[in-house]
UniProtKB/Swiss-Prot annotation:
Highest classification ranks of the organism: Bacteria, Pseudomonadati, Pseudomonadota, Betaproteobacteria, Burkholderiales
UniProt organism field: Methylibium petroleiphilum (strain ATCC BAA-1232 / LMG 22953 / PM1)
Gene name, Swiss-Prot/TrEMBL: fusA
The name this protein goes by in its record: Elongation factor G
Residues annotated to bind GTP: 17-24, 88-92, 142-145
Keyword Protein biosynthesis attached: yes
Residues of the tr-type G domain: 8-290
Top-rank taxon: Bacteria
A GO MF label: GTPase activity
GO BP: any one term: ribosome disassembly
């Protein structure tokens, strides 16, 4: 099958933003203008096409990134047809993992900001993730029709808060209820949309007289930014003071793809203005799969190899999301980096060393789907029939093995016990939790050995709430949940050496004998566990050393203070002894475990608690109370900024254990006018009185 759209006309973009910036509405409008949706879905009615899980429609927030495909020929139908694959990403901080996953497979991102709220805390998180994967991006300032809308304030905030380099390509005409359209700085014309056609039709008009000087100033700013793309353009600009339309587009595109600048657009998605011009910007300035460097990976021998984005290259793709569909079972969303994949093909998963067959391939449009025979380089689609693959794993041609860089997922910070309401729910709950954990790598399930309870862990209260909700809706499992528990950790503060661990049972017959001497040291935070074998002269035979390591590893999940997992320790095996007959692996495992526990007791063990970065946005009248309350929760207030629409943004670091039920307190303290976001920052040592209370409550 020949390609319908050449690869240079593909755009894989994500749309990401803060919770209420109007991201889903913006995506809806894109689908409407590109002719996919005939009736615009409104989030206000809970009918948006992209938000297709029931909870999303009820809560009006986007949780899973739906992937959808649409086609665009430009506002004036002047472009050849381009194919845009859009990934709608969630804006809630508990779902940061979803954003991270989609950033990984995108070629560009459209950042939506609210013209009133400006650059909010979540916007900073998303920006950091986009920096991490060097994603080219453009900005769309939405909600220009709202009271307090200010395009230029958002421009300033992007520079200050995000250290971004925004370059406006359009300017707003008016603001709030007087917002009527935009000035296109490339064409130097005003664009006025026709309201009756829901913005499908528009007119070019002359720039209003009172905006002439301002437009000229911002046009020069834009042309200058374009000229910096190359020496050639710079020389031309310095000589003639002007560049052609094609040169401006080339310059802005080059620098956007290099992530040096971010073109800026504005409008109001809800009132059908400005999204169309931003879509043209996606085509003009966002990269196609061949504009970005070929994707690197490693082959069987761990040598670096690259795959070009071309159909004649060997097949390589990344599975970036799993979803369970009620009709077809498990869907695996893949981004094809190179080659072609046909339904019925076999693919190899190098991480699991397994070969699997692709059943059907579906092109997704939010919650509708179309079956296709093949997907080509640069495409995003969903495959049916893959059993073993999980998020972040590579799929490749069995004859040309490549492992693409794996995604790294954060450790959960909050846990809850769940138990099924009836015996009949027991088995269903196991299946449901297994499926959900497969879909979402930041969600974990385990069984507590002592109590036999099922423990679920995730990135925040809302995260776990939605998991329990999905169990009920999608799998029909009724469950009771316990109180949220904080995921504490233990570590040590001082190094100890010459710690002996001995396990000896010799009472006639075959005995047990294992003896080790360990040195235990603290590691810097986040370094994890490290084991070093420093045995000289075979005092512990080679074959028993893995058993020593295993003995220590088996002791890590249960620390000596309160049974929490031990982190950031380095254990060195320095000496030991063995018995010709009685030594075996089990004896050395036991000896290492005993030695490690004894060593930890002597190495000043401490309890670590998760600290959260909390940002509260509040009207000024309540700022004092909010700060006082955060301090009473052992919070460290780190600063207070003014917000563009008035009010204060207070940043603080607060232990997670003190934040349960905070939303209720904040609501009553501010009469429902303050909002907050919270994300995990790092672990830090719990003060002695807190640690003592934790240890006492665990001992009960």
């Amino acid at each position: 099958m020949a390609r319908k759209t050449p690869i240079e006309r593909y755009r894989n973009i994500g749309i990401s933003a803060h919770i209420d910036a109007g991201k889903t509405t913006t995506t809806e409008r894109i689908l409407f203008y590109t002719g996919v949706n005939h009736k615009i879905g409104e989030v206000h009615d809970g009918a948006a096409t992209m938000d297709w899980m029931e909870q999303e429609q009820e809560r009006g927030i986007t949780i899973t990134s739906a992937a959808t495909t649409c086609f665009w020929k430009g506002m004036e139908l002047a472009f050849p047809e381009h194919r845009i694959n859009i990934i709608d990403t969630p804006g809630h901080v508990d779902f940061t993992i979803e954003v991270e996953r989609s950033m990984r497979v995108l070629d560009g991102a459209c950042m939506v900001y609210c013209a009133v709220g400006g650059v909010q805390p979540q916007s900073e998180t998303v920006w950091r993730q986009a920096n991490k994967y060097k994603v080219p991006r453009l900005a769309f300032v939405n909600k220009m029709d709202r009271t307090g809308a200010n395009f230029y304030k958002v421009y300033d905030q992007m520079k200050v808060r995000l250290k971004a380099n925004p370059v406006p390509i359009v300017l707003p005409i008016g603001a709030e209820e007087n917002f009527t359209g935009v000035i296109d700085l490339i064409k130097m014309k005003a664009i006025i949309w026709d309201e009756a056609s829901q913005g499908m039709k528009f007119n070019y008009e002359d720039i209003p007289a009172d905006l002439q000087a301002e437009s000229q100033k911002w046009r020069e700013n834009m042309v200058e930014a374009a000229a910096e793309a190359s020496e050639e353009l710079m020389n031309k600009y310095l000589e003639s003071g002007e560049l052609t339309e094609a040169e401006i587009k080339f310059g802005i595109r080059t620098r956007t793809i290099a992530a040096e600048i971010q073109p800026m657009f504005c409008g109001t998605a809800f009132k059908n203005k400005g999204v169309q011009r931003m879509l043209d910007g996606v085509i003009d300035f966002m990269p196609s799969p061949i504009d970005i460097p070929p994707v690197p990976g490693h082959d069987d021998d761990d040598k670096e190899v690259v795959r070009r984005a071309a159909d004649d290259e060997k097949f390589a793709a990344l599975a970036f999301k799993l979803m369970t569909d009620p009709y077809v079972g498990q869907l695996t969303f893949v981004r094809v980096y190179s080659g072609v994949l046909k339904s019925g093909d076999s693919v190899f998963n190098p991480i699991r060393g397994k070969k699997e067959r692709i059943g059907r391939i579906l092109q997704m449009h939010a919650n509708q789907r179309e079956e296709i025979k093949e997907i080509l380089a640069g495409d995003i689609a969903a495959c049916v029939g893959l059993k073993e693959v999980t998020t972040g794993e590579t799929l490749c041609d069995p004859d040309a093995i490549i492992t693409l860089e794996k995604m790294i997922f954060p450790e959960p910070v909050i846990s809850q016990a769940v138990e099924p309401k009836t015996k009949a729910d027991q088995e269903k709950m196991g299946i449901a939790l297994g499926r959900l954990a497969q879909e979402d790598p930041s969600f974990r399930v385990r069984t507590d050995e002592e109590s036999g309870q099922t423990i679920i862990s995730g990135m925040g209260e809302l995260h776990l709430e939605i998991i329990v909700d999905r169990m009920k809706r999608e799998f029909g499992v009724e469950a009771n949940v316990g109180k949220p528990q904080v995921a504490y950790r233990e570590t040590i503060r001082k190094p100890v050496s010459d710690i002996e661990g001995k396990f000896v049972r010799q009472s006639g017959g075959k005995g047990q004998y294992g003896h080790v001497v360990l040195k235990i040291e603290p590691q810097e935070p986040g370094k994890g566990f490290e084991f070093v074998d420093a045995i000289k002269g075979g005092v512990v035979p080679r074959e028993f050393i893995p058993a020593v390591k295993k003995g220590v590893e088996d002791s890590l999940p249960n620390g000596v203070l309160a049974g929490f997992p031990v982190v950031d320790v380095k254990v060195t095996l320095t000496f030991g002894s063995y018995h010709e007959v009685d030594s075996n692996e089990n004896a050395f495992k036991m000896a290492a475990s005993l030695g490690f526990k004894d060593g930890c007791r002597k190495a000043s063990p401490v309890i670590l608690e998760p600290m959260m970065a909390v940002e509260v946005e509040t009207p000024e009248d309540y700022a004092g109370n909010v700060m006082g309350d955060l301090s009473s929760r052992r919070g460290m207030v780190q600063g207070m900024d003014d917000m563009p629409g008035g009010g204060k943004a207070i940043k603080a670091e607060v232990p997670l254990s003190e934040m349960f039920g905070y939303s209720t307190t904040l609501r009553s303290m501010s009469q429902g006018r303050a909002t907050y976001t919270m994300e995990f920052k790092h672990y830090s040592e719990a003060p002695k009185n807190v640690a003592d209370a934790i240890i006492t409550s665990r001992a009960k």
